[in-house]
UniProtKB/Swiss-Prot annotation:
Coiled coil: none annotated. Predicted to be exported by the Tat system. The position of the signal peptide cleavage has not been experimentally proven. This is Uncharacterized protein y4mM. Residues 1-55 form the signal peptide. NCBIfam families: dctP, TRAP_S1. Its main location: membrane. The lineage of its organism: Bacteria, Pseudomonadati, Pseudomonadota, Alphaproteobacteria, Hyphomicrobiales. PROSITE patterns: TAT (PS51318).
């Protein structure tokens, strides 16, 4: 059906454009709009046509390591081996240095199929398979070789089953090294010398418990922000393998390096089951490439540690200290004991988590309510993620098609395509706010929290979240009232009520309030260290 447009001062009818004395008529039709949209969507295919033709599958591998890290080198080798072993049928695109987000964000992408492969951190993946955290018990392994013996046996086989149950396939167990302590304050050789320091750890309950057992205060800071945090004195020290300390140049801001060797960590090399299903007959070749790349990564990691340690010892500005490992092991024995059960080491949870598991009968209703709210919040987050993805795609398609119609087809644009972005954009924004709220990303005055400790800090956080939830509920109610009034008027082309944007704000505000309450209940029940959802929050190296 042809849409007629009335120009100012004139007649109704098709738009007319004067060019060189001739009148060209363009009728703005839905058929023309579909043609323009098809042109936009076909653009990637056109680009592909001018490249050398190569049928096959392309997978994306994400990791968080910096250039020069053994993980980075091994990821590139994996891509090379896959291309070689599949005769080019499978291509691996590697994205390192957290370009695809934090380790936890990449795990979320892996499970949804947005990411195919990741070399991830043990702390982040323990959120999916809690039993994996047992590998990080203090002073459990002296070296990688002993850890690999365990992973090559029944323990490793059971871990594979646990990962497969959550939609993920372990291709290999890479090495994240033996971890050591660095700081800017003083030489540390004995456990008592750690007491009183503020140490950055990943958002990994095991590592947090180790340093709290040593008397340190722990702070969770994204790995990409760690150098600046150390430089500015936000924290006194941190713990990482020597390879990470070197590749991220942390020694420049932490001159004291203590060879604590307090824990070993794996780097689970994971593929989504969605990606696995796409590989067909090439799956075995990809698995073989992963094993070969894993052997290289572990060798590079061991070589790098030895090389870096020798280099650190030669630099006069760096003080490397051998520590009383037996003393450190005794000082952190409580971390192991807190995870014991009559049958041995239990599923490794933080020693703060039994607080939730030991609820009395009268507290169980609160736990049930908290679980219900948390499940509701997860469903809302899934919905919000789909809203962001599809509204973002719709915005891009409609706006690009409108530009194509206006400037490529010289048709003056599509009136209804100009209206749609205005209606879609509020949903896009509110979806993003829901995701931020679920990750504990509300605007907050962090320095106030830094001045508080333990229960006071958790209480302040819960109170702030309750205020935020109340404010969003009030905002949603007001948006609903305004929406009812605005609904009287309609858009000129699509004839949609003008209340759509206001109702988007109302719905989004309610969803934000729910996920905010879920975060508050989580902290109220489990404590300060659980304010960030470990599946979607910031968990780094």
């Amino acid at each position: 059906m042809t849409k007629t447009v009335t120009r100012a001062g004139g007649a109704s009818g098709p738009q007319q454009f004067q060019s060189g004395g001739e009148t060209m008529k363009y009728e703005i039709t839905r058929r023309r709009f579909l043609a323009a949209s098809s042109a936009v969507l076909a653009a990637p295919a056109i680009v592909t046509m001018v490249r050398p033709a190569r049928a096959g599958t392309t997978l994306t591998l994400g990791h968080g390591a910096a250039p020069g890290n053994p993980r980075t080198v091994a990821a590139a080798k994996f891509a090379e081996l896959v291309a070689e072993k599949t005769a080019g049928r499978v291509t691996i695109n590697v994205a390192g240095a957290e370009t695809l987000g934090s380790d936890a964000a990449m795990l979320t992408s892996l499970r949804t199929g947005a990411l195919d492969v990741t070399a991830n951190s043990q702390g982040a993946t323990s959120a999916l398979v809690p039993e994996l955290a047992a590998l990080g018990l203090p002073f459990l392994f002296e070296n990688t070789a002993k850890a690999m013996q365990v992973l090559g046996g029944p323990v490793g086989a059971e871990l594979v089953k646990r990962f497969e149950a959550v939609g993920v396939v372990p291709l290999d167990w890479w090495d994240n090294g033996i971890r050591h302590l660095t700081n800017s304050k003083r030489k540390v050789a004995a456990p008592a010398e750690v007491s009183g320091m503020k140490i950055r750890t990943p958002a990994d309950p095991m590592t947090m418990d180790i340093f709290q057992a040593l008397g340190a205060a722990t702070e969770q800071i994204a790995f990409g922000e760690l150098y600046v945090a150390l430089q500015q004195g936000v924290v006194d020290g941190q713990e990482n393998p020597l390879a990470n300390i070197d590749s991220s140049k942390l020694y420049e801001v932490n001159k004291y390096i203590s060879l604590t060797g307090h824990k070993w960590e794996s780097t689970p090399f994971l593929m989504s089951q969605i990606a696995q299903a796409r590989l067909g007959g090439d799956l075995e070749a990809v698995k073989a490439a992963a094993k070969e790349a894993g052997e290289l990564q572990r060798k590079l990691s061991a070589d790098k540690d030895a090389e870096v340690l020798a280099a650190f010892r030669r630099i006069s500005a760096i003080e490397v200290t051998e520590v009383d490992r037996e003393g450190f092991a005794k000082a952190t024995a409580s971390v192991v004991e807190s995870r014991r059960s009559p049958s041995g080491i239990s599923s490794p949870r933080s020693n703060r988590q039994p607080k939730a598991e030991a609820l009395s009968a009268r507290e169980h209703p609160m736990k049930s309510l908290s679980n219900l709210v948390e499940l509701t919040a997860r469903a809302i987050v899934w919905f919000a993620r789909q809203v962001v993805i599809f509204s973002g795609i719709a915005l891009m398609v409609f706006m690009t098609a409108n530009v194509a119609a206006r400037y490529v087809l010289a048709g003056g644009g599509f009136s209804f395509a100009q209206e749609l972005p205005v209606l879609i954009f509020p949903w896009f924004i509110l979806g993003g706010i829901v995701l931020a709220a679920h990750s504990g990303g509300h605007m907050a005055v962090e320095w106030i929290y830094d001045k508080l400790r333990d229960g006071a800090r958790s209480t302040a956080f819960v109170a702030a979240n309750l205020v935020s939830a109340g404010a969003f509920l009030m905002l949603g109610y007001q948006a609903y009232l305004v929406g009812e009034i605005a609904g009287i008027e309609h858009s000129p082309v699509l004839q949609l009520p003008n209340s759509v944007g206001y109702f988007a704000l109302a719905v989004g505000s309610v969803l934000v309030a729910i996920v905010t309450l879920a975060v508050a209940l989580r902290v109220l029940r489990l404590g300060w260290d659980h304010r960030t959802n470990t599946e979607s929050g910031e968990v780094a190296l």
